[in-house]
Amino acid sequence: MPTSADQPGVQLDQQNVAVEAPPDAAQRIEQLRADRMFSSDLSVGEFLLAREAGFEPLGVVVGSSVYHIGWQPQYMTVGSQYGYGFGYGYTYDDQELTVLTEAKLRARELAMSRMEAEANALGADGVIGVRLDVGEYEWGPGLAEFIAIGTAVRARGAAAGSYRTKFGKPFTSDLSGQDFRTLLHAGYRPLSLVLGVCVFAAYQNGWTFQQMSGWWGYGGVNQEVTQFTQATYSARELAMGRMQTEAANLGASGVVGMRYEMDTRLSKSDAEFRDEINETNAGAPANHWRSFVADLFAVGTAIAPLGADHEIPKPSLVLPLDG
């Protein structure tokens, strides 16, 4: 994942994250430490299972970043197009929108780094139950708020401090309290949340244009739109590959709980925007070239063995006596 130094005093680096918690967060954390109480977004069952696994919750930790996403240049090719007839001119290449990919990745890094900074201030060994949310503002085009939130935990007794990553950071995981306990009992420990992001655009070519144009001809039959299928494949593979690379860089043996979220949209063309603004279309349907955008986010928890000699307990059958 890329590194960043977007703000004074903020340095993002996968091996040495140095981000100070904001003053209000520092005050809240100091109060938690002084009162010797904890806060948690774990359920009652998750809380009890985390304690049974040897960890004490310390407090809810939060990181956020309101990020402006910049302008994306688009690359074109001179060539021929088949549509209704044959034409020659400029066409957009199917391509990753790297400016958008990088912006969404850096914003999530900032949010997670600030969450880790709060956990570090609490003396935590890690953060469990992490959620990553994104909110957009109607009043701010191009603005998005990226939020990371979870419960900081610390191992009890002699194990305290031993679950931090090899870089001295608290581990992060989106596993629930139940899954966290099961993972530890199976002889593995979480290392870090690993992310992969890709925003990919496919610009409607002549064949795709025919497939999607009206009820006559090719537009009136069931068929796969292969250009858009390929775009979703490309976005998925790029995002998952980046997530796997990040896990490998941490020395992980694998990734568990992996999930991906994909948002797809079909944009309006420049001509359609001009028609809406100038009202030159008079309600007539517009047959303009459009772009298909696949926005994909992959996330999971990288894990490593606790030790080579650990044996997984055999499952046992328990029969309730209360009927």
Model-derived features with residue positions:
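Intrinsic disorder/low-complexity detector
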Residues: 2-100, 143-228, 269-323
